[in-house]
A protein has these predicted regions:
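Active-site pocket-lining segments that scaffold enzyme catalytic pockets across diverse folds
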Residues: 144-153, 163
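Short helix-to-loop capping/linker segments positioned immediately adjacent to catalytic or ligand/cofactor-binding
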Residues: 95, 153-161
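A composition/biophysics-driven feature that prefers long, compositionally simple stretches
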Residues: 1-148
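Short alpha-helical functional segments enriched in proximate histidine and acidic residues
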Residues: 12, 156, 173-177
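Short catalytic-site patches enriched in acidic/histidine residues
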Residues: 29-39, 124, 161-208
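Charged, amphipathic alpha-helical interaction segments
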Residues: 148-151, 158, 175
Length: 208
């Protein structure tokens, strides 16, 4: 599954004239490798190459991935950008994704001034947008579970309940249906809160 996804990204890179790309978005790296970690402020990148010699750049604080790619480890005290710069081809155009922080990109550009950097997020984003059969089945199952949980939540709500009570109930129902987690605390909004598209459930009580 992951190799097929990588192959689609490599094909898109080839259409852009790229032989290498640095993927830094954690969700995109998870999509391509199955390795799930959130790096916060630390460098984290998956280096894709046309020849298949891919590399995963990781801080030693991260768990060891089960991924069949060369792993390049570093610590907070290492010159990790020099390590990265020396591992890539500094003479060929480099694709980068749209979310890579300037604190990483600018030093890399200084290390390899002969390299042209190209915004190449579409190579990964377009692959992620085109769902395969497994993903479509997972989406259908997620939608089914969501329908079940929303029906339970509607039946559960009573006058006097707080937004947070209902939100916590919804989370518990997703867990009961086998979900690992929710992307965020469910949005439960009473009254004027309904005008806030990203409202965080609080202690406001439901009034009839």
């Amino acid at each position: 599954m992951y190799q097929e996804r990588i192959s689609r990204v490599l094909a898109a890179m080839e259409r852009m004239g790229l032989e290498q790309m640095l993927v830094s978005d954690p969700d995109s790296i998870w999509y391509l490798t199955g390795y799930d970690v959130f790096p916060f402020e630390r460098l984290y990148a998956f280096y894709l190459r046309k020849d298949g010699q891919h590399k995963l750049f990781l801080n030693k604080l991260f768990p060891v991935p089960e991924a069949p790619y060369e792993q390049v480890w570093f610590s907070d005290t290492d010159d990790y950008l020099a390590i990265l710069a020396n591992a890539v081809d500094g003479e060929k155009d480099m694709g980068v994704d749209k979310d890579w922080p300037a604190r990483f990109l600018l030093p890399l550009m200084a290390h390899n001034p002969s390299c042209k950097y190209v915004l190449a997020s579409d190579c990964v984003d377009d692959a992620r947008a085109c769902k395969d059969a497994v993903e479509r089945d997972l989406m259908r199952e997620a939608s089914r579970i969501n329908d079940v949980v929303m029906e339970r939540a509607a039946a559960y709500m009573k006058e006097g309940m707080t937004e947070r009570e209902v939100a916590d109930y919804i989370v518990a129902q997703y867990a009961a249906e086998g979900c690992d987690s929710t992307a965020f605390l469910p949005i439960v909004s009473y009254g004027a809160h309904a005008a806030d598209p990203h409202h965080e459930a609080d202690q406001t009580r439901l009034k009839a």
